[in-house]
């Protein structure tokens, strides 16, 4: 378990290092002095100085910073204009101003962030997210090169179903659904998960020929035994319904289902089948939790289930591709991750998914640790590939989140710089400072709430 957590923290740290290194290397390229390059927050554990930069590893491993000379974040506590005199400053603000002046006196201010052109500053701020996307691409190359990609090939067609009426056949490859591009099976799965009742205008290829058809899902109401869990494809429980048999029995989010009644489970479909065919008898789940296998016995409950059946099944098996194909589908992998993050944010704000879906650093480490544990049975290479897959997703996620126009994040700072480029003059520093300060406070509050949720989910 300790090793799993260490690996998870290591991966997150690498993602942060790459982000901050993006800022660092582009700042250096533009002649900007980097005062401090740090990994983590809090007290310094290890630090040394090389040239004009102090390099630090700090106590809390989540996060990092690339602090540049003349960067307004160097003196976040001073939200005063240059015209303010010392009598109007609080003791804390005076101390912050002294620190700022001490730093400025020790360096050449012509190498400060603020002294550079607006386009140089835009490049420096944008570099962090861009490097995250580059890291996601490198991880994707390793994954696709090793395992291939997962096209949306139709594997099974049910008799007398909407799929047969639409003329679909086994082996057809879906490339578009209702105007949404489908490169991977996951594209189709994600769309269907939140649009199950919609008629599907499908573009597909058969023997190299492009074709179109329309599938109207069949609305089915039936009685089924359920326990009240949501799973991903790898049998990892993403959520447990409140007051459900699963919650009462003790199943938890992030448990990984390994077996049901002693039978190993290969995917989420096999788990669902085991539950629905139980006939209401008690079902014993063997789940991986905190590095151990735990048995949890649940009594399924009969509920009326509404579903929309298309009549075809896609397994999403990966297939190998050429070196050129590897590069192509690696770019598509990054695009998929970016698109998924943006769509998930949209669904979060529209209420399609709940706040419980958010994960902070603790929740992310916990989930990564469980996935590492789940992968061990397949060998070290698959542990490595699963970590690479998570790194690609998290790195792309970090890139997108940092580009959002939120004060105190890279995206918020880019907004002010773009305004400066369009106006030909910067926004007043005191105004920008106030906005960034408020944004930072709100961001810290959100982080604390998510952190609290993550910690409570561990118990």
Regions found by a protein language model. Give the residues of each.
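Terminal peptide-recognition signature
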Residues: 19, 57, 128, 163, ...
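Internal alpha-helical transmembrane segments
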Residues: 64, 90-159, 445
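Juxtamembrane extramembrane loops of integral membrane proteins
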Residues: 71-78, 158-217
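PDZ/PDZ-like domain segments forming the peptide/carboxylate-binding groove
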Residues: 137, 143-176, 180-183, 221-259, ...
